[in-house]
From Swiss-Prot:
It catalyses: a 2'-deoxycytidine in DNA + S-adenosyl-L-methionine = a 5-methyl-2'-deoxycytidine in DNA + S-adenosyl-L-homocysteine + H(+). Its EC number is 2.1.1.37. GO terms for biological process: DNA restriction-modification system; methylation; negative regulation of gene expression via chromosomal CpG island methylation. This is Type II methyltransferase M.SacI. It comes from the Bacteria. It is an enzyme of class 2 (transferase). The active site is at C96. Keywords: DNA-binding, Methyltransferase, Restriction system, S-adenosyl-L-methionine, Transferase. NCBIfam families: dcm. InterPro entries: C5-Methyltransferase (IPR050390), C5_MeTfrase (IPR001525), SAM-dependent_MTases_sf (IPR029063).
Amino acid sequence: MNHELPVISLFSGAGGLDCAIESCAEPPLVQDGSGSPLRVAVATDYEQTALDTLSANFPHTKTLCGDIQTIPTAELLEAGGLKPGDPTLVIGGPPCTPFSKSGFWIEEKRNSADPNASLLDEYVRVVRESKPEAFILENVQGLTYKTHQAQFDRLIAGLKDAGYNPTFRVLLAAEYGVPQLRRRVFVVGRRDGKAFHFPETTHSGESERDRVIDHTKIPFTSLREALAGLPDVPEAGEVVEGTYAELAAEVPPGQNYLWHTDRYGGRNEFKWRSRYWTFLLKADPDRPSTTLQAQPGPWVGPFHWENVKNANGEERARRFRVAEMKRIMTFPDEFVFTGVKREVQRQIGNPVPVELGKVVVRALMEQLGYLDSRGTTIPSQAGHEQLELI
């Protein structure tokens, strides 16, 4: 083994958490090329397009495409040039549809009967058999809901049985400087039995649940701040057309379809609370974005707060462009996405925001003794191969 600390990445997608892994030595919210002592040795996903994106950005990472249920842990280790006990971390976010709001209306998903829910067991299997020093699992907060308690309890029990001490917490990305009101649950565990301590929040502002602002912290990062400096380059398919095109264009920034009810100033087209909150939702430039979705419907926001003209000169709402979505998800501007727009939207909308992942990875690496509080690699920990299994 070389001095780089190897990581196994499961359900990698386009590499959001992988990007956090390979930049964790950078200060929070800074992309200065400081790098990381960690390197993703091998990554898996069932979508080749997502792995093409990952390979375009991390050419040193070996990739395996396929259903994780058919990939033995030994094959993962071999692809990464590893043996049990070698990986510093196992990371990943199993497909979240069974636990997300977007899939909640399907009864089998409410009850965690969706086949994808069993992928949590596959994550536990790889952790148990590869014996990393620690692991990070992330998912939508819906995984912690009472409707999924049996599945979540099974996950925690499995990780404990594998010899780890898992702790979990739902984190709001905006509270760590990400320009998005996106909540993700993180489950983190160490093989040495010590508990992981989650990093303190650094930012404060109004969210969909909290109107109390802590003025001792940094204000939330607004969309206007996050998207500043991007060139105004139109993209194909960005104009919102169809049945509700005119209504979407008339919605003010920060409002949604409720603008067109009898309680607000628009047309009286909809009944109060008859649609999803994201229906015809227009972003507020002075606040963080609401959650970007991986597979939004044609009239599902958030849309950009500024309208554009269509080919006929009519005013229309527009969707966020790829460069803008990368900023909202805190991917580096130079990060390359492969595939058609629909595939890119899914790749950007699925992962944890990079900077949210980075603060968790950085905290774990500090607590394991690989980084100091400034993000500097501690030389005495370079001999990772000397660590013994517990």
